[in-house]
Amino acid sequence: MAILDLSAIALRLTTIKTQDKALFYEHISNLVEGGVTILEALSSFSDKTDNLRLKQEVLTITEFVRSGDPLSTALKKLPRIFDRGEIAVIEAGEQSGTLQRSLVS
């Protein structure tokens, strides 16, 4: 018989608000614009956010990026959180060299 981990279930049910994602994009954009790598920016955000669900997802994104995925590909792996429109804008920014601008557009 499995024991339910209620804290894990509660965490999965916690939503990530649009405002929280906007802060995520702004934080990453500011750091990338300042010359910080995506990995360092993701790590910085996960250290600073109070949203435990978003922190968990950013740690997952960090692992995908660390293994070689571009940010857009890492986000595609979390479709319940990041929609196609967001990902398309980020992917265009990666391809054009304007990622920091695409994160806040």
Where are these regions (language model features)?
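Catalytic metal-binding core of the metallo-beta-lactamase
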Residues: 1-105
